[in-house]
Amino acid sequence: MRVLVSNDDGVDAPGIQVLAEALRHAGHEVMVVAPDRDRSGASNSLTLDVPIRTRRIDAQTCAVAGTPTDCVHLALTGMLDYDPDIVVSGINNSANLGDDVIYSGTVSAAMEGRFLGLPAVAVSLVTHNHQAHNYDTAARAAVEIVARLKADPLPADTILNVNVPDLAWSDVLGFEVTRLGNRHRSEPCVPQRDPRGHTVYWIGPAGPEQDAGAGTDFHAVRTGHISITPIHVDLTRYQALDTVAGWVGGLTAALDGPA
């Protein structure tokens, strides 16, 4: 298959290089289109206020001065001279568990691929303090999952979010299909003083696990399993539709009131 590979850690990150090489070794034609620097936390943002510059590193690698979503969007809307068959994003150098997927550039790159009509997988290595040791395990998991997707495709609105414990392949206990867990609210932001005496802020750490019991992605990884979570983008809160519908009469009446 023709595989488009992207990430949010940047085109030079070790995770994307290991992933691309593993996919090539499995017989796939791989094109890497990734940010020219770390764009972690970029979520689904597109660059609309300035033109986006690109730089060909070699015939199979392109660096983009933009977000992960920019990378996939450009690659699938005319920048390449062929159409890929699948998007694989990663390997991220940290977890994308539970609420993380809302902010994750790794997941968003896969999501953009799905929006533009391709099957998509996001792969993350759940490291401690961003010190990764087993990218090869995550890459092997990605290769196996891509093979299954080719043989048994998923519905067109589905993205696979894969989280891999930082273990040797022989130490992984298995694969688990999971749902997204949840974290507590984020830790406080971190204020500092710059050299001119002005207060600046760093975003604080993600909150600790909250909904992380059996069946969640958190639990699977914590117990030595590779978590596969099928996700889709429909933010409708169906349970609230009837309640909000009950407001409509009053809201409509307000239209007849004084301006």
Swiss-Prot record:
Instruction: List, separated by semicolons, the cofactors it needs.
Output: a divalent metal cation
Could you give the cofactor binding note from the entry? Binds 1 divalent metal cation per subunit.
- Provide the transmembrane region boundaries: none
Gene Ontology terms: cellular component: cytoplasm
Query: PANTHER family, per this entry?
Result: 5'-NUCLEOTIDASE SURE (PTHR30457), 5'_3'-NUCLEOTIDASE SURE (PTHR30457:SF12)
The entry assigns this protein to a family as follows: Belongs to the SurE nucleotidase family.
**Which NCBIfam families is this protein grouped with?**
PRK00346.1-3, PRK00346.1-4, surE
Name the chain's protein.
Answer: 5'-nucleotidase SurE
